[in-house]
Amino acid sequence: MLTCNKAGSRMVVDAANSNGPFQPVVLLHIRDVPPADQEKLFIQKLRQCCVLFDFVSDPLSDLKWKEVKRAALSEMVEYITHNRNVITEPIYPEVVHMFAVNMFRTLPPSSNPTGAEFDPEEDEPTLEAAWPHLQLVYEFFLRFLESPDFQPNIAKKYIDQKFVLQLLELFDSEDPRERDFLKTTLHRIYGKFLGLRAYIRKQINNIFYRFIYETEHHNGIAELLEILGSIINGFALPLKEEHKIFLLKVLLPLHKVKSLSVYHPQLAYCVVQFLEKDSTLTEPVVMALLKYWPKTHSPKEVMFLNELEEILDVIEPSEFVKIMEPLFRQLAKCVSSPHFQVAERALYYWNNEYIMSLISDNAAKILPIMFPSLYRNSKTHWNKTIHGLIYNALKLFMEMNQKLFDDCTQQFKAEKLKEKLKMKEREEAWVKIENLAKANPQYTVYSQASTMSIPVAMETDGPLFEDVQMLRKTVKDEAHQAQKDPKKDRPLARRKSELPQDPHTKKALEAHCRADELASQDGR
């Protein structure tokens, strides 16, 4: 690369096809020359478009020549789109070289080097300053790849592994417009160059590995996953071992990264595509999701619940039996979550007909797991909407198998009584310990230094248990009431929070006088 400052110009010129820095010239339109000269003029225009301009430090420099290049690119896009037999063998190296000169560059430093989660609604992406030219170069190259005249056997000499590697590096661009073009370009190359397919998959794997285990920052993960979704869809059956390893060792660990929300829809699609291809992968996939389940990130939990429902929508009944117990133990925890969106999303599973049919076939295993969590939270959860959803789930369980529901009720009641007896025994043990302590001559000395209190029996696990018949009636009534949705007719009103008042603070505020009030009192 050489920088040309001649005549005040700030162009950066590619020297590979020229004898040094030069000013661009306005060439004739390709349509205005005889057919015999069109190929030569086409090559001249491609070389002319290898001149790079400064759009960053001085956007107003070389405006005339920037427009000349833009017009040349637009003309070439039109030319190869509407004409046949114009992509001759000498054109291939010129097109690939022009694309490489314009596109393969060092990306600017990230505007978000800490790797915090990008929020599309709040954060503005950093846009590429030279986009007026880059967009047309991408459009031209795509039309070149998609042309009926394009011959991969000729192009493979120029579009090779080095070219693909440089193309993949551009996926870290912060400009979403560029990543969108890159996604389409790479997909076309993958489709046309069979010899590059394994290499492309391998290099995408490497990008994912670096992202998961080293940087946790890359702008193009969603776009790469979107390409992979299409690739996975085309995998032949039975799946190769390398594809299964890719799912288990590359795709599933992507769930660990904190910026999951940026690419989760594309990731979930890839996972579900694999399960539709091979249902035997269901157990390792679900167990991996349960292993990576978020502990303190509620929005991420909602994403996991969304993905699990997508998996359950395509699961085979024989595979469901293998994962139902650990899965519903996790769902029971989600129903108990104080974050209402997590509890709500988990309870929406009971609105899915296919999932309900799977639950119905295996109710004897699932209901005993879910019942304690559903019952406890039917009264103690702070969000009233959750109460209605829980009663709906209990009602469905009750209609599914009345005897099993009653058995679970009695079993839960017995366990509650056991817990109360155990608590009572603990209280009595503490009373004995305290009485023994009182018998010690030095008790009065130590009792003044520390205050001891007898443990109070606390109901920490839900309300006192109703009678079975009463529970049935309560569940039916509450589920019916929840379906009515009384909030529907109420006008929307924002509820104001009421902060608990400390009496000492309140008294101090009432007694407080501002400085000007004190001054006026002194003046009197």
UniProtKB/Swiss-Prot annotation:
Keyword annotations of the record: Acetylation, Centromere, Chromosome, Nucleus, Phosphoprotein
User: Can the keyword Phosphoprotein be found in this entry's annotation?
Assistant: yes
Q: Name one GO molecular function term.
A: protein phosphatase activator activity
BP GO terms, sorted: DNA damage response, signal transduction by p53 class mediator; intrinsic apoptotic signaling pathway in response to DNA damage by p53 class mediator; meiotic sister chromatid cohesion; negative regulation of cell population proliferation; proteasome-mediated ubiquitin-dependent protein catabolic process; signal transduction
Indicate where this protein resides in the cell. Nucleus; Chromosome, Centromere
Q: What induces it?
A: Up-regulated upon DNA damage.
Question: Known InterPro entries for this protein?
Answer: ARM-like (IPR011989), ARM-type_fold (IPR016024), PP2A_B56 (IPR002554)
Tissue specificity, please? Highest levels in heart, skeletal muscle and brain. Lower levels in pancreas, kidney, lung and placenta. Very low levels in liver.
| Family classification | Belongs to the phosphatase 2A regulatory subunit B56 family.
Identify this protein by name.
Serine/threonine-protein phosphatase 2A 56 kDa regulatory subunit gamma isoform
Organism, as annotated: Homo sapiens (Human)
**Name of the encoding gene:** PPP2R5C
